[in-house]
Amino acid sequence: MKRLLSWLTGLVVMAGLLFSLATPSGVQAADIRNVADDKIAERGDKVDLNNSSVRRFQQFPGMYPTLAGKIVLGGPYESVDDVLALDLTDRQKELFEKYRDNFTVTAPSIALNEGFDRINDGQYR
């Protein structure tokens, strides 16, 4: 009797495994979207003022870290011009205007703005 029960249990387990392998993966899991990749595609080559970390401003001489920090902490923005409403020095406004065409604004994403990830994104050299 124990042997029969053991065989039946094994048969049920094997049938379950075969059924799980036979079902398509689309049935097993919903379409998973990566918010960060979607935002990268949306912004293109520009720096998104609502979702980028201060490190993205390193490519613009004079902006990192002081002006970049002010911009990151001053958001969210409706348009790129909203940055000029911040308390910036004349030099900082001049720098921002110099690189203005390199920036864009998309809707803020919780996944990219949670905690202090925009100030310290954990990337160290």
UniProtKB/Swiss-Prot annotation:
Q: What is its main location?
A: membrane
Q: Which GO terms describe its biological process?
A: photosynthesis; photosystem II stabilization
Localization, per the record, is: Cellular thylakoid membrane
Q: Which Pfam families match?
A: PsbU (PF06514)
Q: Does the keyword Thylakoid apply?
A: yes
Q: Which domain of life is it from?
A: Bacteria
Per the UniProt entry, the signal peptide is: 1-29
Task: Please provide the record's keywords in A-Z order.
Answer: Electron transport, Membrane, Photosynthesis, Photosystem II, Signal, Thylakoid, Transport
Q: How does it sit in the membrane?
A: Peripheral membrane protein
An annotated GO cellular component of this protein is:
plasma membrane-derived thylakoid membrane
* Main function: One of the extrinsic, lumenal subunits of photosystem II (PSII). PSII is a light-driven water plastoquinone oxidoreductase, using light energy to abstract electrons from H(2)O, generating a proton gradient subsequently used for ATP formation. The extrinsic proteins stabilize the structure of photosystem II oxygen-evolving complex (OEC), the ion environment of oxygen evolution and protect the OEC against heat-induced inactivation.
Q: Provide the family line.
A: Belongs to the PsbU family.
How this chain assembles, per its entry, is: PSII is composed of 1 copy each of membrane proteins PsbA, PsbB, PsbC, PsbD, PsbE, PsbF, PsbH, PsbI, PsbJ, PsbK, PsbL, PsbM, PsbT, PsbX, PsbY, PsbZ, Psb30/Ycf12, peripheral proteins PsbO, CyanoQ (PsbQ), PsbU, PsbV and a large number of cofactors. It forms dimeric complexes.
Task: Name the chain's protein.
Answer: Photosystem II extrinsic protein U
Q: Which organism is it from?
A: Synechococcus sp. (strain WH7803)
Q: What is the lineage of its organism?
A: Bacteria, Bacillati, Cyanobacteriota, Cyanophyceae, Synechococcales
Name of the coding gene: psbU
